Amino acid sequence: KPDLMQNNTNDENLFETVAKYRMPYILMHNTDKPDLMQNNTNYENLFLDMASYFADKITTLRNLGVKDIILDLGFGFGKTMEQNYELLRRQKEFEVFSLPILTGISRKSMIYKPLDISASQALNGTCFLHAFALENGANILRVHDVKTAKDCIKLYSLYKNNMKK
């Protein structure tokens, strides 16, 4: 049996399968199919729209008996670069759901495009933004470069622990 399920289609049948096998589920915010999502970045209010989306899906999953849900805010999926940065800055607001928040920004275009580099060259920018993600509520980082992410988390933890003294 799989350890974890994620699917950005949010298919009700998939939710039933997740419930049946008592699997953790990563619930990602996404507005559309991959080939159309970047055409659908106009939100009346990004945060209210996302909160409503998550509330609806979480209710459905809970009603089916799914206990382990992780929120993925869907960086890069149906959001402009500006929306992605605002989302990173304000992701702590999604703690209202009392669920772990997964942040997946590693090598995303929001990093490499403004730096005019390739995705494979975006390690420094990724590390820099991972620290902000942790500061702003990320519990889980989805990464490409595991050792570098572990180093970032270790240094961030030292920083946070020294802030408490």
Describe the predicted segments one by one.
Residues 3-63, 78-165:
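Active-site-adjacent loop and "lid" segments of alpha/beta metabolic enzymes
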Residues 74:
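Conserved Motif II region of HX4D acyltransferases
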